[in-house]
Design a protein with these regions (language model features):
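Nucleotide/phosphate-binding catalytic cleft detector across ATP-hydrolyzing
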Residues: 1-109, 117-234, 240-276
Length: 276
């Protein structure tokens, strides 16, 4: 979080880098250093720690992308590296009964990807990975501000808008005082944004997620589809915290939608349980 707040604010000789983008490695060297840092935080007393590591990957990641992740972890000092697909980890963390003979559907809206999966009897019946999620929402807000208000804003400001007034269905008169740089004059400028503005900016991304969910439902076997009427759909990931996103998905699919307890931590919790 400390590094994230530095995005767009660093000195000329300092560069803020995202090691991962869209759920896969964007910078091999920085990813290796990041994993080394995490290992040191866990094994504070051991200089020669070489732990077993379990890493989540998007279901749509390629064999090359998966190997790159494993290679980074091994280079960082891991003794053994295993991979788990994100929706499985999310479902475990959300306490879904994936080992039972009933169908469960999880929608994990993370930073780089949205993972959609239908599971039953401990396996994945259908999965889809969309490379649109929280980061794409931020980019949509940046583009909207530029197009509608000639205002240039950064990633951290876009994320703040998303958290403050971002919504899938406008339901209040909440506003947000937006500050940025006027593209034409180059001077600082501020405008007042409404929930309706934020929703309009986010809707193209939300429509892609809705399309992915519909595709998953169309590819679900009839027996499991019947289970989903009772079980509903479960949302995890930071994107699940977007206001009214559960209502939007429920309206679009006609199915009950619930947000998991502590959606931000579901993938991490599920990965930890799987490692045990």
């Amino acid at each position: 979080d400390e590094a994230k707040t530095m995005l767009g604010r660093t000195q000329g000789n300092i560069q803020a880098i995202r090691p991962l983008r869209d759920g896969v490695i964007a910078d091999f060297i920085v990813t290796e250093e990041m994993i080394k840092h995490f290992i040191k935080k866990v094994h504070k007393r051991s200089t020669f720690a070489n732990p077993r590591i379990l890493i989540c990957v998007p279901t749509g990641s390629t064999p090359v992308e998966r190997k790159a992740i494993q290679d980074s972890a091994l280079a960082a000092g891991a003794r053994r590296v295993q991979l788990i697909e994100e929706p499985i980890a999310a479902a475990i963390g959300a306490n879904l009964p994936i080992s039972e003979a009933t169908g469960s559907m999880v929608i994990d809206i993370g930073g780089g990807t949205t993972e959609i999966a239908v599971m039953s009897l401990g396996g994945v019946v259908y999965s889809n990975s969309l490379r649109v999620a929280g980061d794409a929402m931020d980019n949509a807000l940046i583009s909207y501000m530029r197009k509608e208000y000639n205002l240039m804003i950064g990633d951290s400001t876009a994320e703040k808008i998303k958290k403050e007034i971002g919504t899938a269905i406008p339901s209040s008169n909440n506003t947000f005082l937006m500050k940025g740089r006027d593209i034409r004059s180059g001077t600082p400028k501020e405008i007042e944004l409404t929930e309706k503005d934020a929703c309009e900016a986010l809707m193209p991304i939300l429509n892609q997620i809705l399309g992915g969910i519909k595709e998953a439902l169309e590819n679900t076997p009839p027996e499991l589809s019947a289970d989903l009427i009772d079980m509903g759909l479960v949302l995890t990931g930071g994107g699940a915290l977007l206001k009214n996103i559960d209502k939007l998905i429920s309206q679009d699919t006609g199915l009950p939608v619930t947000i998991a307890d502590d959606p931000l931590s579901c993938v991490a919790i599920g990965t930890g349980r799987a490692l045990e």
